[in-house]
Design a protein with these regions (language model features):
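Conserved PLP-enzyme active-site core in the AAT-like
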Residues: 12, 37, 55-274
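Short, compositionally biased
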Residues: 99, 415-423
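Conserved N-terminal alpha-helix of the aminotransferase class I/II PLP-enzyme fold
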Residues: 15-59
Length: 423
């Protein structure tokens, strides 16, 4: 006589596995039994203290930011995080909730990639004196940073390095590992569900062995700040079941899949496609060199009953996994190679200039706001996360003044309205 209301007898067929926090089922944020044992198994697989999230990397990012803030305050400093401009919206929302300052890193290359090098990071640390650094690796397009050299810079200047590794849980199982914790990061989150055999919402929070033990002791407490009090046992069960797969068959399956994906990429290049270099398990096509927008290629794929992870005017992103069959990859090859190449499209994304800050993120997000047409927003202060596509660096951040440059970028990506601070 306890929750859930379906009593294990619902219409979908899996309700019997959907438990709640009854005797013997343990509690995610006060784990002493089977959940604690399962998380320890995951910790052994990743070589560091690892904790489950049933709310994706969003909960992990919020928790990492809490640790970064608490670490700064413990040293008598106001939290100020130096972050790559391609940070996920959950990082920006965390800034509003936790009231920390952000200094943005734009990188020194195309603004869509936010490629940050060690020398850029060191210069920024010296100039802005942050209490921590937060970077995304890999990004949505599959670009990889040199985490090892970036981590060395952070250690040299005694600032913590947190990595949003949402797209790279599988990197731990490469030879050699490219996982951020193995390369020197202090904190890291993985969206297990993105690249591993885990249900949507399943994620990991990893803490390095070198991180202050105080934060390891408090991590579950911090996670509770943002989490539902009813975490999904179905998602936890999938994280637990994945442990055995990761410990036994996954490395070999991943190796075979990487070889198949590499072969497919080579075939596509021979056909004339431009494939971005980066992580091995992501196929990112820069479509305009082939004479099409990403939207046009995506529509053709969907006519072949193949649904891409992402597409826009410039790119299409495909995310195979070891659980795609060889027939899946062959069907993808046949569909893409059935498209005839056309003259290159020369229109490129508009250049994004750095925006002027009028107030901090917290002030902007919690201000009274109104919605305006983008074309009428020049000079207004943005009050919401406006970007409509994951790969792009945000054209304007809450608290920044909307410029002609940011308006041009928003229009390019089809953003028609924007919320601004009410005057």
């Amino acid at each position: 006589m306890h929750m859930p209301g379906h009593k294990g007898a619902g219409i979908l067929g899996f309700e019997g596995m959907d438990l709640t926090e009854i005797y013997g089922a343990d509690e995610l944020f006060a784990a002493e039994g089977i959940i604690k044992e399962s998380e320890q198994n995951a910790s052994n697989l990743f070589g560091c203290p690892t904790y489950y999230s049933t709310q994706g990397s969003t909960l992990c990012i919020q928790t990492m930011c809490t640790i970064l803030c608490q670490d700064a305050k413990s040293k008598g400093k106001k939290p100020k995080i130096l972050a790559g401009r391609n940070a996920h919206r959950s990082f920006i929302h965390a800034a509003a909730l936790l009231d920390f300052d952000i200094e943005w890193l734009y990188g020194n290359s195309d603004y869509l990639s936010c490629k940050i090098h060690a020398e850029d990071l060191e210069k920024a640390i010296i100039e802005s004196h942050p209490t921590a650094v937060y970077l995304t690796n890999p990004d949505y397009l599959g670009n990889l940073l040199d985490i090892q050299s970036l981590a060395s810079v952070c250690k040299k200047h005694n600032v913590l390095l947190a990595i949003d590794n949402a797209h790279g849980a599988y990197l731990r199982f490469l030879e050699p590992s490219l996982h951020p914790i193995d390369l020197g990061a202090d904190l890291c989150c993985d969206s297990a569900h993105k690249t591993l055999p885990v249900l949507t919402g399943g994620a990991y929070l990893h803490l390095s062995d070198s991180l202050n033990q105080v934060w390891k002791n408090d991590v579950k407490h911090f996670m509770e700040y943002f989490s539902s009090t009813s975490p999904s046992y179905l998602i936890m069960a999938s994280l637990d079941a994945a442990n055995e797969v990761l410990d036994t068959t996954f490395r070999n399956s991943l190796f075979e899949c990487i070889q198949s994906v590499a072969s497919l990429k080579n075939t596509l290049v021979q056909h004339g496609y431009t494939i971005l270099s980066g992580e091995p398990m992501k196929i990112t096509i820069s479509t305009k060199e082939f004479g099409y927008t990403g939207n046009e290629i995506a529509n053709h794929l969907m006519e072949c009953d193949i649904y891409p992870e992402f597409y826009d005017s410039d790119y299409i992103v495909l995310m195979p996994s070891p659980y795609n069959t060889k027939d899946d990859l062959k069907r993808l090859e046949t569909c893409l190679c059935g498209i005839e190449r056309k003259p290159i499209l020369i229109n490129k994304p508009p250049k994004l200039e750095q925006s002027k800050k009028a107030m901090n993120v917290r002030q902007a997000l919690f201000s009274s706001s109104i919605t305006l047409d983008v074309s009428k927003s020049l000079g207004q202060v943005c009050s919401s996360v406006t970007v409509s596509c994951p790969p792009a660096i945000l054209p304007v951040i809450p608290g920044e003044v909307i410029s002609e440059s940011s308006i041009e970028v928003m229009k390019y990506y089809g953003i028609e309205t924007v919320r601004v601070v009410k005057e």
